[in-house]
Amino acid sequence: MKNPFIELCGCICLTLLTLAPQPAAAKTAGEVPPADTLRTVFFTDIHVTPGNAQDSLFRIAVAEANASDADLVIFGGDLTNMGSDRELAHVHGLMSQLRKPWFTVPGNHETTWSESGCTTFRRLFGHAGCVATRAKGYLFLGYASGPYMKMADGMIRGEDLAWLERQAAAARPGERIVSLCHYPLNGDLTNRQEVTETLKSVGVTASLYGHYHQLQLRNFDGIAGIPGRALAGKRGEAPGYTLLDFFADSVRIREKPLGMPPVTRYTVCLKDDPQILALPC
C-alpha cells in the first residue's frame, strides 16, 4: 500500500531540541542511581484489527522501534477496536515481533467489549491489568481503568489501588515511580480523587495516559499527565507515535511521525513543574 505521508519526508525540515541530563545527586549505600537517559517508545490507541489501516501502520511502527535506540516499549491500551479474541491474538503477534522489552495495560476497548471477560488478555499478556516494570532507575506501575461494562465510566478498582501501594512500598531506594493508565486521571474516572491521592501518597509525580489520541499535557491534582498520541492521527496528521526520554529529573516528549524525524513537543520536570501546575485539574 502506498503511504503518502512518507513522501513528505523530503519537504519537511525538523529541528530537534536536545536536553542534557542533570548531574546525579549523591547516593546512599544501595541506592539505585537516577537514570542517565531512559529512551522509550510509547504506543497507545493503536486500534489494530486484522487487515485495517492501523494493522499496516503498526507493522511499520514496530520496524521503526526495532531499528531505534529505545530501551523499552510501553503500550498504553486500546490495542484493538472491539477487544475480540481474534483481534487480541493478532495484535499480540505483532507486538511479539518487537526486539525490545515491552509491556502493556488494557484500554477501554479491551475491557468494555471483551468477549472473554478479559481472560484472553490475561492469557496472552500474562496479567489481568496490573504490571510493574523496572528500567534504569525507574519503576513503571501500570493498571487497568475499565470500564467493565458498556456505557459505564472508567474506574480504578480498589484491589488495583492496593496493588499500587504494595508495589510502590517495594520500590528500591532512589527509584522514580511513574504511573501508567489508559484513561487520564480526571473526571472520566468515577474515583479520580482517590486514585490521585493514592499515587501522591506513594511518591508518583507523573502518569502516562492515552485515550484522547492527542499530545496534551494535563494536571492530575499536581501529578504531571504525560500524553501519548494515537497511531492513526487525526485528519490531516501523519500517522505516528510518541517517544519519551526520561532523564534524572525530567522527561522529554517527542512526536514521531512514521517515516519522519521526531519533533520535541514538551519537556516536563518530574516534580512540581510550573507548566503542569498552571493547568486546571
Segments (PLM) and residue ranges:
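Bacterial N-terminal signal peptides that target proteins for export
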Residues: M1-G10
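N-terminal active-site segment of His-dependent metallophosphoesterases
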Residues: P23-A89
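Active-site-proximal beta-strand elements of phosphoester/diester hydrolases
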Residues: T37-P50, G137-P147, V178-C181, A224-A230, ...
